[in-house]
Swiss-Prot record:
One of its GO terms (biological process) is translation. Gene3D superfamilies: 2.30.30.790. The gene is rplS. This protein is located at the 30S-50S ribosomal subunit interface and may play a role in the structure and function of the aminoacyl-tRNA binding site. One of its GO terms (molecular function) is structural constituent of ribosome. HAMAP family: Ribosomal_bL19. SUPFAM superfamilies: Translation proteins SH3-like domain. The lineage of its organism: Bacteria, Pseudomonadati, Pseudomonadota, Alphaproteobacteria, Hyphomicrobiales. It comes from Methylobacterium sp. (strain 4-46). This is Large ribosomal subunit protein bL19.
Length: 131
């Protein structure tokens, strides 16, 4: 590890932020701090993560949602002080790192299949009842 990577790791450790493990295709809720005049409030922005870029302190992710029939994309720096929290609501099954093709799709064709978790009990049979 070179000096710059080491310094970045130290800065990330100082920030003390817990970032969930999410990938493109996952539906996330990003709670963003919005300053209006003197007061600050938290606004939820929910959408599909369509890509991640960068690394270390400079890592960004793009979230796309449909608002009033219009597609809206927003790029968030992961370690931004304006981000209050990130929550993953749904895991998506995709085969691409960048989901820019979703920009051209509407309705059912823009849906992303849900990814089954490896450690889940959904695929296992129910235990037999003891007699």
């Amino acid at each position: 590890m070179n000096i710059i990577q080491q310094l970045e790791q130290e800065e990330i450790a100082k920030l003390n932020k817990t970032i969930p493990d999410f990938e493109p295709g996952d539906t996330v809720i990003v709670n963003v701090k919005v300053k209006e005049g003197e007061r600050t409030r938290v606004q939820a922005y929910e959408g599909v993560c369509i890509g991640r870029s960068g690394s270390g302190l400079n890592e960004n992710f793009t979230v796309r949602k449909i608002s009033y029939g219009e597609g809206v994309e927003r790029v968030f720096p992961i370690y931004s002080p304006m981000i209050d929290s990130i929550k993953v609501t749904r895991r998506g099954k995709v085969r691409r790192a960048k989901l820019y093709y979703l920009r051209d799709r509407r309705g059912k064709s823009a849906r992303i299949a849900e990814r089954a978790e490896r450690g889940s009990d959904k695929g296992k049979a129910a235990p037999a009842a003891a007699e």
